[in-house]
Amino acid sequence: MTEEQKKYEDAENLESKSENPEEASAEKSENGVEDLQAENEKLKKDLLYSKAEAQNTRRRLEKEKSEAIAYSVTGFARDMLSVADNMERALAAIPDDIKQDEKIKNLVTGIEMTGKELLNILQRHGIKRVESVGQKLDPNLHQAMIEIESEKPEGTVVQEMQAGYTIHDRLLRPAMVGVAKAQSGETKSA
């Protein structure tokens, strides 16, 4: 190989080397753009997920707050129910002939009015009495204490020993009830 040919080859090699870095640089920049686009998409998804999670957390906290407000009187209401029960028992214990006595009549009327006012106040705060007598036994609302022979269908509440109450949609106290059972002379039909 002559010296001229060597110079020519060296020039070609030098020229091809100078072209390769540009091509390599272009390939790297294309890969870099793709990487950045992929990272951008991932960050967008992460941002959307974070926003959705924050919104769900906000909704859950608002619901918990409203429930806390609605049910904040639960303990106090249970205590007041025992007062209402005692007033009912006191009135029930007074014989009818004494209720008619002029000296006691106004006292009895005052106790009855106080009991009604107490129940009205409880109702204003979402506390309602559970209707039991004549209803089918519902274990979510009633606590069966005894079975009583009755002509009513089996499982029907025939006696209420203690009233049950709900606060909004939750049970505050179950009603203690007596439930009908078939009379001893009757046979069960299958």
UniProtKB/Swiss-Prot annotation:
Main location: cytoplasm
Biased composition (Basic and acidic residues): 1-31
Highest rank taxon of the organism: Bacteria
A molecular function (GO) term: protein-folding chaperone binding
GO cellular component, one term: cytoplasm
Family annotation (Pfam families): GrpE
UniProt-listed Gene3D superfamilies: 3.90.20.20, Head domain of nucleotide exchange factor GrpE
Subcellular location: Cytoplasm
One GO BP annotation of this record: protein folding
Region (Disordered): 1-39
Subunit details: Homodimer.
Biological role: Participates actively in the response to hyperosmotic and heat shock by preventing the aggregation of stress-denatured proteins, in association with DnaK and GrpE. It is the nucleotide exchange factor for DnaK and may function as a thermosensor. Unfolded proteins bind initially to DnaJ; upon interaction with the DnaJ-bound protein, DnaK hydrolyzes its bound ATP, resulting in the formation of a stable complex. GrpE releases ADP from DnaK; ATP binding to DnaK triggers the release of the substrate protein, thus completing the reaction cycle.
The family this protein is said to belong to: Belongs to the GrpE family.
Name by which UniProt lists this protein: Protein GrpE
Protein's gene: grpE
